[in-house]
Regions:
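Short, surface-exposed, polar/charged, turn-prone segments marking secondary-structure boundaries
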Residues: 18-24, 46-50, 81, 147, ...
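Conserved AAA+ ATPase small/helical "lid" subdomain
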Residues: 44-101
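Canonical AAA+ ATPase core
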Residues: 1-69, 109-114
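An amphipathic alpha-helix signature
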Residues: 26, 30-34, 76, 80, ...
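Hydrophobic aliphatic residues
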Residues: 11, 33-37, 83, 129, ...
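C-terminal engagement/docking regions of AAA+ P-loop ATPases
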Residues: 77, 86-166
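Residue-level detector of secondary-structure boundary/capping sites
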Residues: 6, 70, 144-148
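Alpha-helix boundary/capping and short turn/kink residues
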Residues: 23-26, 71-72, 118-119, 163
């Protein structure tokens, strides 16, 4: 569901990720319903239960650490080639732009940092493809009516672009 007014492609491209979030499991959904329905008015959930887990400085430091993760030229080229392949794939009517490649590398750096590495790998880039590119490409109408998804086509693109070795 896109909401009342879908965003234009130029605005969608400015979002770093599109993460798909599913419904909660039955037990958690029941807990939510009970918590909210037991209160008169409002959401029924107390903001007082929220605890700070990091400071703004922590976030800035993490961003700086992620930016410092090394991205060697062959892996950056791989990210660029993946994005360029979205523009050439027959099932995709609108491919990703340069921001998509930049975002692939940035998210790959974050993945590497979270795994304790100071460098990105082609696997980090592959892992980033779906959340980074799924909102940046559009399927051709002929493919969209077949029930295939953007994720299906992005996975097909990944299979066609050779990853660097070594």
């Amino acid at each position: 569901y896109e909401g009342t007014y879908p965003l234009p492609e130029a605005q969608l491209d400015r979002f770093l990720l599109k993460v798909l979030i599913d419904y909660p499991d039955t037990q958690f959904e029941a807990w939510i319903v009970k918590a909210v329905a037991s209160k008169a008015g409002g959401s029924g959930l107390s903001a007082g239960d929220v605890q700070q887990v990091c400071t703004p400085e922590d976030i800035l430091n993490a961003q700086a650490e992620a930016a410092a993760v090394q991205a060697v030229e062959p892996v950056v080229d791989y990210a660029v080639n993946l994005v360029r392949a979205t523009r050439q794939h027959s099932a995709i009517s609108l491919g990703a732009g340069t921001r998509g490649a930049i975002s692939l590398v940035r998210v790959a750096k974050s993945y590497a940092l979270l795994e304790g590495r100071g460098y990105i790998t082609p696997s980090d880039v592959k892992r980033a493809v779906l959340p980074v590119l799924r909102h940046r490409v559009q399927l051709s109408p002929e493919i969209a009516i077949t029930g295939q998804t953007v994720d299906d086509m992005l996975n097909a693109v990944v299979r066609t672009v050779e990853a660097p070795r070594g």
